[in-house]
Amino acid sequence: ITIIEASRRLDAVASGGLGLSRSRIVKMIDKGEVLLNFREASSTATIVQFRDIISLRNGAKLVVDEVTTTSKGKYRINLRRSGSDQRKVQQQSSSDDEDDD
């Protein structure tokens, strides 16, 4: 998966790589459901780097394979999904929607 983001913030990269809204990722980070390099992510503003591993407690995982800069100064981030498929990510999103009610 290749995403283009204005920053390398954890919430932006996770959102782009997992196909979830940035606000959803922020809520998940606040609830302790997002891990960065196997440790609970403490801030949405954490900068993601090469070889970082972003994972959700449900098993979905992203590995940062490459970070380069575009000609316009944005970041081209190559991610690899592992440990889960998109259905688990969608299930997490659906269960979060129910929790918000």
Residue ranges and their predicted role:
Residues 1-15, 40-101:
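Strongly charged
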Residues 2-31, 35:
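C-terminal accessory/binding modules appended to enzymatic or scaffolding proteins
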